[in-house]
Amino acid sequence: MIEPTGVDGGTVSAADWRQVTDLPMQMGIVGSSKTDLQAKINALETLLEAARRRQRFYSGPRVYIQLQLDGEANTWRSEILAARLELVADALNLWPSAATEARLNITRRYFWERTTTATAKSSTTITNNASNRLTLDSILGVIPTPAILDIRNNNGAAINFRNFYIGNDVEHGFTGTEHRVAGGTYSYGAPITHNNLVLRSDVSKTVADKCAGGYFHMLGGFSSLPAGIYVKERLFVYVGVAELAQLADGPEIVSTGQQLVDFGVWQIPPGGISASSGISFYLSAVAGGSGTITLSFLQLTPARDFLHLYNRTYNIPDGGGVVWDGGTQEVYSINAASTARYATMQHMAGGVNLYPGKSNYLYVLCDEGSGTYTDTRQLDVTVTYRPRRLTV
């Protein structure tokens, strides 16, 4: 059922689903002997204890109850969170015949998911630039479900990929390269004093209207960002070419020479208002010497479904890659033959869901171990998932 968290007559702003306690299930247990009957009861109780331990200590395998409806090809499962087996009154009357009656009480997840995965997108090549988007339609099921991502190196050589940023746009409907905002170049021959505005990136009224007050990770791709300078993004509203006011600013970041930077989460437009004018991001910097800053782009990456994966050290071979299972929260690197898994990956933040009944636009952006961002890198991406539903 839905947990109501708003006031009566108001908006339920934090509605969520609660776990389900099913009606007690009556069951008969039959053994080949009284000893076999006792062993079957103990085996079932051991399984239910494993479910309890899984919830309390987050260790051991998950335990599921499975369902297959008459005439349906697929089997569905729901994870057991707590359960108790009780013998009914007079249950021992049947004991001499190696049989008994029992009642099974189960609390489970609020959803059923398929025991087999479905494919949202078979292996598709994307490029690490404005062509980094996959369109996923026809997602099965009723409610959102975690994505399972298989991202493979398709560059003809081993690459030391480091950060993977993945986002899913289901609300804003960016088309073409609207998720990208152009950057620019700024050369400085003397130190830059505190909070100098050096580069402007304009978000058009059309794109700002599509953002509709949503929250976005602002990912900046640089072809030149010298180490040792301090940079931050600031958000201004403008009419024509004139800035009217600063609306927000982000965290100040010390550059280590990396060329792909997460400037944090921004509401665009601030306050959730429809944009009556465009908005601009300004890069401000503090530097002690001379140099050149070249910002290639800012990418608007929806923050609600945002995933950051980090590869500690592994040179991913050609054909090898990274696998993320959003359902189990497992991540690992894998060889080209898919025969060996390596614990080199770290889940830094977030996750990505897929949404039935909507167009899902998945973005993947990555850099490399030296901090380099290379916009010609190619990745083969496969997206699968387990469809989820609430009842039948």
Show which residues each predicted segment covers.
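Extracellular beta-strand ligand-recognition surfaces/modules
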Residues: 142-148, 262-298
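Short, surface-exposed beta-strand/strand-loop-strand elements in extracellular ectodomains
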Residues: 161-164, 231-241
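Extended extracellular/luminal ectodomain segments enriched in beta-structured repeat modules
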Residues: 20-22, 141-146, 207-219, 228-230, ...
